Amino acid sequence: MIAFRHVSKVFGSGDTVVRAVDNLSFECPAGGFWAFTGPSGSGKSTVLHLIAGLTPPTSGRVLVDGADVAGMTAAESAALRRRRIGYILQSFNLLPFLTARENVGMPLVLDGVRQAEVDARVNDALALVNLAHRAGHHPTHLSGGEQQRLAIARALVIRPAIILADEPTGNLDRHAGRQLMDLIGDINERTGVTVLLVTHDPVFAAYAHRVLRLVDGALGQDMALVDKRRDPARAAAR
């Protein structure tokens, strides 16, 4: 479960104060798929940074499975990101001199996981994103959609409880973006991983179970959506 309790985040001081998040409260259950939308500067990405412990709240509490993220030490916060949270960004951030397999396994190698376990987890992650047949290829030989799927596999290889996806379709065309969102929805359903998506695109936001629209850091609208995987009519419309 991810919960915000009257969370505010203020940057700057004096005449340059920016209230990125303003008294925001919500509770996302484990296994949920939620989307945050809103105009540029509405605080969407800051919400993800707060969850990951990349920035502390100015006031309020950010809870991940009951643990107060702001109360964690730097080492505890780093461990949360390394072992519990997978991050997917607009930029793929793949290392071009490594193969797809090596890119996916890198988080585990850096965490000291033994090689046999690395190999098994990488195989599982590549299969989950339908890239097992491209394991030996370098990122420069993959399409944009394949590179983003590879980035998702890298996020999944740690077997996270939470996926934070910040504009993951931003560098993809419409068709590849829809394929990616289908994949993220499928992964949420098959693995039970909690997904929090940031997107400015209402079409991609509609893949989520719930959409929170932020305006100037505050909750402007909260919409519960029908789960399209269980609604053939909406699935066809997609």
Where are these regions (language model features)?
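ABC family nucleotide-binding domain
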Residues: 1-207, 214
